[in-house]
């Protein structure tokens, strides 16, 4: 057994790119018209599997295929390890039988959503996986079913999201990562991920247009179909899945210039409720842009309720966090 240090980049995990790094070359994928089982590492037939697969091999050899096949579904046998993280009470690595439902993982194993908040979505498969909505929480988890709903098994990542999560922001976050990790070899992946991130940024900052949704879908399909490796082939998943299941959230950002989850800072408006304001001045003290005016109430003088100048406000949220009387509202 020999252990080699990989290239480090996300794309270097792709099979042919991984072999290239072992050979000492740049970790770029190559065309698959010749499969690695025919010509792989140093142009020799090569069988590449991940660590989890190799860990199962000794048990299958010792106990037989029938023993291993007792667990799982028709098309996905055995168990799967997931990294369960996000808005869930119990986080960590969990090993579950194939075919278990998302509900069982999130609620029975994960302990549900903290603070009594509502489950919104779960993203599976790593950075290029798709987001699965609450309406599909009883979906059995296996390779085929995850692919059918626009996600994938991938590296076994599972990020739970609650009602405070903005799906446009989620798509933008993952596209930012994927555009940086693209090796740039194929135009579709290099330019497609970059352009999708640019459009998502425009939408989240209030410059979105109705036609942007269809443009994102078109870019996503072209990027997936024309890319050389699985990174480009799956990179649009965060965008396409969030549009598929949360289109209304995109429309709210574009048409009403509003972020329902109150995450996209450029679309937020902070307002002091004068009837609730205690005129303590806490909000004005922490405002970095001096956008809040008013007069502090003292024993000798009457105060003036504070107000926020929208032109000066940088939407940092400091006023909202500092107010103990819930006199600052976010719209």
Residue ranges with predicted function:
Residues 99-115:
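Short amphipathic, charge-patterned alpha-helical segments
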């Amino acid at each position: 057994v020999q252990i080699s240090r990989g290239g480090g980049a996300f794309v270097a995990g792709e099979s042919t790119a991984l072999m290239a790094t072992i050979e000492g070359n740049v970790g770029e994928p190559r065309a698959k018209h010749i499969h690695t089982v025919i010509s792989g590492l140093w142009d020799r037939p090569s069988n590449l599997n991940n660590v989890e697969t190799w860990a199962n091999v000794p048990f299958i050899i010792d106990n037989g295929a029938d023993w291993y096949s007792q667990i799982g579904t028709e098309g996905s046998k055995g168990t799967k390890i997931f990294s369960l993280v996000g808005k869930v009470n119990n986080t960590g690595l969990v090993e579950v039988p194939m075919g278990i439902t998302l509900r069982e993982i999130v609620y029975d194993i994960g302990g549900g959503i903290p603070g009594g908040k509502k489950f919104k979505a779960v993203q599976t498969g790593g950075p290029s996986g798709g987001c699965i909505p609450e309406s599909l929480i009883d979906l059995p988890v296996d390779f085929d079913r995850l692919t059918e709903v626009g996600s994938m098994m991938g590296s076994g990542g599972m990020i739970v999201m609650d009602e405070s999560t903005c799906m446009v922001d989620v798509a933008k976050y993952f596209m930012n990562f994927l555009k940086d990790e693209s090796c740039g070899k194929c135009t579709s992946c290099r330019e497609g991920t970059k352009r999708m991130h640019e459009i998502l940024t425009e939408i989240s900052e209030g410059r979105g247009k109705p036609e942007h949704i269809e443009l994102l879908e078109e870019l996503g399909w072209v990027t997936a179909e024309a890319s050389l490796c699985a990174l480009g082939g799956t990179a649009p998943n965060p965008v396409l899945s969030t549009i598929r299941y949360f289109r209304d959230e995109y429309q709210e950002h574009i048409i009403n210039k509003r972020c329902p989850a109150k995450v996209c800072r450029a679309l937020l408006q902070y307002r002091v409720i004068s009837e609730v304001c205690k005129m303590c001045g806490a909000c004005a003290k922490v405002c970095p842009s001096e956008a809040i005016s008013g007069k502090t109430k003292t024993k000798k003088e009457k105060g003036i309720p504070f107000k926020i100048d929208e032109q000066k406000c940088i939407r940092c949220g400091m006023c909202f966090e500092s107010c103990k009387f819930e006199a600052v509202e976010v719209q």
